[in-house]
Amino acid sequence: MIGGLFLNTLSFVIVSNHPIVNNTANVHHIQQERVIVQQHHVVSARTQNYYPEFSIAVLFVSFLALYRSTNFKTCVGILMFKILSMTLLGPMLIAYGYYIDGIVTTTVLSLRFAYLAYFWYVNSRFEFILYNTTTLMFVHGRAAPFKRSSHSSIYVTLYGGINYMFVNDLTLHFVDPMLVSIAIRGLAHADLTVVRAVELLNGDFIYVFSQEPVVGVYNAAFSQAVLNEIDLKEEEGDRTYDVS
């Protein structure tokens, strides 16, 4: 779509697919048939050549309409490019005679925008269009894309420290993690609370949000835990002094 991606498509075939008229008055019937046959072969060859390029253009527009990112600045840039494509690039292609390219570009992007605008209207949050997704999680007013887990179960894990956690590109500070809650809105609707805070060996935490309480956390890296415990015992043994 940029830099001539749409210059070789089926719309060019439509412009080129005009009957070849021989203005000479004294043309035999056999020659006219040969001209028609040659014209048919030329148009068929052009159509076969432009089908793959048209398919690539359609796939590119579809990819652009569905592409999403978790980075805020990237999402802003992509959204601005989509708006320019719908309002400027699509009509420009139509004005220059590339009707199929312009119609496909404008229609696909507009339909995607209208679909996301429904969630924007229902939830009164523009982030559905910004992040190009139908489901968002809100942590104390801050929006971030929600990634579905396996088996369509709804839970969220956030990485952080003893008094903070990372929400996408933002850092949320808190006093008590039990006061932090997550609201899932869009295609899924759920309210999650902190059910477990897992402390890592380096001092960081992984906060687990779920609708169901967590019974326990299994330490799969038991060898690392055993080695760490041995190191602590050796340090304590080195600090033991004989006072007798």
Swiss-Prot record:
Protein keywords: Host membrane, Membrane, Transmembrane, Transmembrane helix
Extent of the signal sequence: none
The CoV 3a-like viroporin CD domain, residue ranges: 135-214
Transmembrane segments: 47-67, 75-95, 102-122
Subcellular location: Host membrane
Principal location listed in the UniProt entry: host cell
Topology of the protein relative to the lipid bilayer: Multi-pass membrane protein
CC terms in the record's Gene Ontology section: host cell membrane; membrane
InterPro entries per UniProt: a/bCoV_VIROPORIN_3A-like_CD, a/bCoV_VIROPORIN_3A-like_TM, Coronavirus_Orf3a/b
Keyword Transmembrane helix among UniProt keywords: yes
CoV 3a-like viroporin TM domain sequence ranges: 41-131
Pfam families: Corona_NS3b
Top-level taxonomic group: Viruses
Family membership: Belongs to the coronaviruses NS3b protein family.
Name assigned to this protein: Non-structural protein 3b
Organism: Porcine respiratory coronavirus (strain RM4)
